[in-house]
Amino acid sequence: RPFLILRQIVQHLGSGRTELVDVPAPGPRRGRLLVRTTRSLVSLGTERMLVEFGRGSWLSKARQQPEKFRAVLAKIRSEGLFATVSAIRSKLAQPIPLGYCHVGQVLDAGEVPGFAAGDRVVSNSPHAEVVSASPAFAARIPESVSDEHATFTPLAAVALQGLRLLDAKPSETVVVMGLG
């Protein structure tokens, strides 16, 4: 393995603290792409929202995610207040990796058809030196596309999925709000 420890950007949802941490490097796995990062893009809208969410109070978090708040109330009714608070604290104590606009070079293709070591790929993987990428959310990058330009692919995919959900027709006009 070329890397034993790598650096990754994570956020602690309980405190809102974002930091660069040393984590064990993923190893080769059948059905996964092991990718060394060459570029990673920060989505100002989505990632800023996540950082601000993490910095918010418990009340703020509940207001932003009413469906999870309802699940918490149901858990209190079924398991009690102490067990529910313990579960929430445990969940908020787990750092989450940030990022989803990733470009890199395949180190190990994990026997995934259509990919080989050395391929340049774009994926929805987090900001880290080496990632284990899902082939379902990865694509080979054409030679004519730079790594820098390829990092924008996941942002375009999010917009495209929005259009699919909207079921917009080519003749229709749509308004995009949020820009991130």
Which residues fall in each region the model found?
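Short structural boundary motif marking the start of a folded domain
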Residues: 2-9
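Short glycine/threonine/proline-enriched tight-turn/helix- or strand-capping micro-motif at secondary-structure
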Residues: 16-23
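Glycine-rich beta-strand-centered segment in the early N-terminal region that forms part
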Residues: 26-41, 50, 54-124
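A glycine-rich, Thr/Ser-enriched phosphate-binding loop motif common to dinucleotide/cofactor-binding enzymes
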Residues: 98-100, 124, 142-167, 177-180
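Flexible, gly/ser-rich surface segments that form the specificity/activation loops bordering the active-site cleft
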Residues: 125-130
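Short, compositionally biased
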Residues: 131-145
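Conserved class I S-adenosyl-L-methionine
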Residues: 172-176
